[in-house]
Amino acid sequence: MFRNDAISVAEVMKLKPKGIVLSPGPCTPNEAGICLELIEKAGPKIPLLGVCLGHQAIGQAYGGEVIRAPAPMHGKLSKITHTGKSLFKSLPKSFEVTRYHSLIVGRKGLPDSLIATAKTADGIIMGLQHKTHPVHGVQFHPESIASEHGHALLANFLELAGLAPRRRNAKPARHAA
């Protein structure tokens, strides 16, 4: 784990990560350290998951516009619907998520390279996916205990990145005496 202003893109790429999570933060994508450049460099080949600010950075990096949300959503729950694919594979068609943001990726001018994969009832984009790169973003916080199916969504990202955890046997291993 690294702060987005405490490591360079070159240093990240040297680490040869199998997946990258761009985490939340209190600023705009322009103020988010190396995030925009990292999306540009790593996005075509390394699976990326952007959460909140990371989602906004993905939208901006590919030509979308980050705008003020109609209302600040700090600690609010919203029901979303989604495509049922990629990050949302095998999840209920609609579920509640936790939101902590005042900025969003705007619907108008969403670049052709990005697909909105989840939204609220009033049409706010809650999920994005790049059409050809292994890049995904969610505006909400799947890591929040109040977000339904957050662990399953994160497990889906790990699977997409080829990092799905191995299943363990329920029985403990026997040791020779």
What are these regions (language model features)?
Residues 1-7:
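A short beta-strand-loop structural module common to alpha/beta enzyme folds
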Residues 7-16, 109:
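Short amphipathic alpha-helix with an adjacent loop that forms part of the alpha/beta core around
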Residues 14-90, 94, 154-156:
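Cysteine-nucleophile active-site neighborhood
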Residues 52, 101, 141:
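Histidine-centered divalent metal-coordination motifs
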Residues 77-79, 125-127, 137:
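Conserved hydrophobic/aromatic beta-strand scaffold that supports enzyme active sites
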Residues 86-132:
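Catalytic beta-strand/loop cores that center a nucleophilic Ser/Cys/Thr
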Residues 132, 137-148:
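Phosphate-binding/catalytic loops
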Residues 144-177:
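Acyltransferase
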